[in-house]
């Protein structure tokens, strides 16, 4: 699965079977806050959300930002 980062839109996205899934974030005060994780039900249950959150998390660490989450899915993912 190819994940694309669109920094001008503050999101990571992927297209699977013609459906777009994405994570949105904001950067403020040295923190990257994962705000929303959206995966259409047609492509749910395939681990897509986890891969998108991981890509966002990895980006935060690479850029010396503290990853935090407002998104309930990402909160649980970050606790693992």
Per-region residue spans from a language model:
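Structural motif
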Residues: 6-8, 28
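A short, internal acetyl-CoA/4′-phosphopantetheine-binding micro-motif in the GNAT/acyltransferase core
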Residues: 37-44
């Amino acid at each position: 699965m190819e994940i694309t980062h669109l920094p001008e839109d503050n999101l990571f996205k992927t297209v699977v079977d013609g459906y777009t899934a994405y994570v949105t974030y904001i950067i403020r005060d040295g923190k990257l806050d994962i705000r929303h994780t959206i995966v259409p039900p047609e492509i749910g249950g395939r681990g897509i959300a986890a891969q998108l959150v991981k890509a966002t998390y990895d980006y935060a660490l690479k850029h010396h930002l503290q990853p935090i989450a407002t998104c309930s899915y990402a909160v649980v993912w970050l606790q693992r």
